[in-house]
UniProtKB/Swiss-Prot annotation:
PANTHER family per the UniProt record, alphabetical: PRE-MRNA-SPLICING FACTOR RBM22, RNA-BINDING PROTEIN MRN1
Protein name: RNA-binding protein MRN1
Lineage of the organism: Eukaryota, Fungi, Dikarya, Ascomycota, Saccharomycotina
GO molecular function: mRNA 3'-UTR binding; mRNA binding
UniProt keyword DNA-binding present: no
Note from the entry: Present with 7950 molecules/cell in log phase SD medium.
Subcellular location field: Cytoplasm
GO biological process per UniProt: 3'-UTR-mediated mRNA destabilization; cellular response to cell wall damage; chromatin remodeling; mRNA splicing, via spliceosome; regulation of translation
Gene3D superfamilies in alphabetical order: 3.30.70.330
InterPro entries: Cwc2/Slt11 (IPR039171), Mrn1_RRM1 (IPR034195), Nucleotide-bd_a/b_plait_sf (IPR012677), RBD_domain_sf (IPR035979), RRM_dom (IPR000504)
Length: 612
């Protein structure tokens, strides 16, 4: 790690901690973050230990020169340290005037440090110099603490320092809080977490189940219009081609960040060979807005005895190509048939009315690709990132798809940096955040009142250990909450709590993801309650104690809120699965059969206090 010491004071080893500054000679401990042209992201070279990080930094005015190093870094209150035996790398474009007091300048640009050349920097502080850079009267030292230094980490939770501050989050937290800045145009080509450019419209998926269907695969795609899907069972791989690279990039980054899992298999994500869109497909997209989805209207015509069944549609249409899914809306007399490719759908729209007399009087055209619908979670994430006011998230749905994709990609890039910087590469996609040193009398309701920034899947409080594990629906929300809590602190009952990463949550189950996209949350809304009539009963039903007793049979209840003036109440569960179960079962209770039951809004998904 590189820190700056004022050149006029570098001989005073006893006052080194007082002389730490950045390139601009202010009191900020961090080097300034780079502009988009100078941005550089480096992955750590070591794969061991829980403190690995990706450190993104570099001075704005130094061109392509990069001075933060690879390796395991720990941020202490007054200095930087680096774990021993890790490699580092300097990149010199001729701007830096490299000087070395101990050795020759040529030794400065080696990829692996030479331990025999290290010399004592300060006996009092137990520092050892690795390298030194001089620029604009500032000296930049890379150094490490000796191995006999006492560990500053909490024994119970190695992800947080003893003072409650996460050691590696500060730089990446700054990246998140400044996430509105544009991402770099040219990304590192060899960076596996490249969220900024796509080499192809086609995403490769490896280790897929041999019996995987097109529908099962595309149930996981929510990033844009799909041109074509190919599954190769004998090679256990698949290729999903989109009509544009931005949609491919969003799916690629989302699959990596969320650790795409299909059929209990961890899916390998990569890029397919770059290809051009078929000229026929491109022309029909341009003129007719062609998609994989074929719309058939006027399915119920006067004189016809019955609707067209899904089985009959499959028989009539399977000759045109593999079918993804079929949806029939009988009351409207319409059907939507998704094919595996746009070309197959074009063949149906062009030839079906001609080749099959039954469809001559039907309305046949293109519908919207189901993979291009913006989910509730995407709306929520994009709204927070774009600073949309609470309650206006639905307006995101009407925004330009590419605009939303860019916002989600920038969020994904920041989330990946946060997750890997603090917990290593294996922490990518983790949705569980650890909260420690909680007040002894804390209630789970108080924690939920303090957690903001994302919908929750579950929250678990261990009262005997004064710790809590919060699992978000989306890993992006978890990473942002972790960063903001580490940067600004997380307090409950005016006590600052420790923040770290919990055990990896794994990917969100697809069934739960679909439920969330349809509005599911851990909050159950009960409306049309007659509180006046209930008060006249000998035993009231709609009291907090009675409702808690009724709803507790489906899972732990976190909070119950009453709004008598609106004739409703809200029951918040600690787990979203319990809320889904309650919504499904509560109608069997005679007191609730005539009431309006739906999902409410999870208050933990509100905008974080720091960003309001």
């Amino acid at each position: 790690m590189v820190v700056s010491y004022n050149n006029n004071n570098n001989n005073n080893n006893n006052n080194n901690n007082n002389n730490i500054s950045n390139n601009n000679n202010n009191n900020n401990m961090f080097p300034p973050f780079p502009s988009s042209d100078d941005f550089a992201m480096y992955q750590q070279s070591s794969s061991s230990g829980p403190y690995q990080e990706t450190y993104a930094s570099g001075p704005q005015n130094f061109g392509d020169a990069v001075y933060p190093m690879n390796g395991n870094f720990t941020l202490l209150p007054s200095d930087f340290t680096r774990e021993p035996n890790d490699s580092f790398f300097y990149e010199n474009d001729g701007i830096f005037d490299y000087q070395r007091i101990q050795q020759q300048p040529t030794q400065f640009q080696t990829k692996q440090r030479n331990d025999s050349q290290q010399q004592r920097f300060s006996q009092e502080q137990n520092f050892e110099i690795d390298n030194e850079v001089v620029h604009n009267n500032n000296r930049y030292y890379e150094y490490e603490r000796s191995s006999n230094e006492v560990s500053p980490f909490d024994d119970e939770n190695p992800n947080v320092l003893s003072d409650g501050m996460s050691p590696t989050i500060m730089a990446t937290a700054t990246a998140v809080t400044n996430a509105n800045a544009p991402l770099p145009v040219n990304a590192q080509a060899n960076n596996p977490l490249n969220f900024t450019s796509a080499p192809s419209r086609t995403v490769y998926l490896g280790n897929v189940p041999p019996n995987l269907s097109v529908k099962e695969l595309l149930d996981h795609v929510r990033s844009g219009v799909v041109e074509d899907v190919k599954i190769i069972p004998e090679k256990m791989c698949a290729f999903v081609s989109f009509i544009d690279e931005s949609a491919a990039l969003l799916f690629h980054s989302d699959a990596i960040l969320k650790r795409l899992n299909i059929g209990d298999r961890d899916i390998k994500i990569g890029w397919g060979k770059p290809t051009r869109i078929d000229p026929i497909v491109a022309a029909r997209i341009s003129t007719d807005g062609a998609t994989r989805n074929v719309y058939i209207g006027r399915m119920t015509i006067e004189g016809e005895e019955s609707h067209l069944s899904e089985e009959q549609l499959r028989v009539d249409l399977e000759e045109y190509g593999e079918i993804d899914c079929i949806k029939i809306i009988k009351e409207k007399g319409i059907a939507f048939i998704h094919f595996a490719s746009i070309l197959n759908a074009i063949k149906v729209v062009t030839n079906l009315p001609i080749r099959n007399p039954y469809y001559q009087n039907k309305r046949i055209f293109y519908g919207k690709d189901r993979c291009a619908f913006i989910t509730k979670t995407q709306q929520h994430n994009a709204a927070q990132f774009l600073g949309v006011q609470p309650g206006m998230e639905h307006m995101i749905e009407f925004s330009d798809r590419e605009f939303i994709s860019n916002a989600l990609l920038q969020q994904s890039a920041a989330a990946a940096a946060i997750a890997t910087s603090a917990g290593g590469p294996n922490n990518l996609g983790n949705r569980t955040v650890y909260l420690g040193s909680l007040p002894k009398d804390v209630k789970i309701e108080e924690i939920c009142n303090a957690v903001r920034g994302g919908l929750l899947q579950s929250i678990k409080l261990l009262n005997d250990r004064y710790v809590c594990f919060v699992t978000f629906i989306d890993p992006t929300a978890a990473a942002q909450f972790y960063a903001m809590s580490s940067l600004y602190g997380f307090t409950v009952q005016k006590k600052r709590c420790k923040v770290g990463w919990g055990k990896h949550s794994g990917p969100l189950p697809n069934a739960l993801a679909l439920a969330v996209s349809n509005g599911a949350s851990r909050n159950v809304y009960v409306g049309n309650i007659d509180f006046v009539g209930d008060s006249l009963r000998d035993e009231r039903v709609f009291t907090e104690s009675n409702l808690r007793h009724i709803f507790q049979q489906y899972g732990e209840v976190e909070q119950i809120n009453f709004l008598p003036e609106k004739n409703c109440c809200f029951i918040n569960y600690t787990n979203i699965s319990n809320a889904i179960l309650a919504l499904d079962k509560i109608k069997s209770n005679p007191y609730f059969k005539d009431l309006k039951i739906n999902f409410g809004k999870d208050r933990c998904g509100n905008v974080p206090h720091q960003s309001r």
